[in-house]
Amino acid sequence: AANQHLCGAHLVEALYLVCGERGFFYTPNKVGIVEQCCHSPCSLYDLENYCN
């Protein structure tokens, strides 16, 4: 899949899809996934780094 900008609910949804039952770390007040995926586009591989 092409890299895409994912913010807010879209980002959480994508994490659910990628991580499934493993769950994930989502701390919106921390730098990291929002910088990586919202402010600039990220890939599914990037998202997988945030799975538990």
Swiss-Prot record:
Disulfide bonds listed in the record: C7-C38, C19-C51, C37-C42
Pfam families reported in the protein's UniProt record: Insulin (PF00049)
GO molecular function: hormone activity
Location of the protein in the cell: Secreted
Function, as annotated: Insulin decreases blood glucose concentration. It increases cell permeability to monosaccharides, amino acids and fatty acids. It accelerates glycolysis, the pentose phosphate cycle, and glycogen synthesis in liver.
Family statement: Belongs to the insulin family.
UniProt protein name: Insulin-2
Naturally occurring in which organism (per UniProt): Huso dauricus
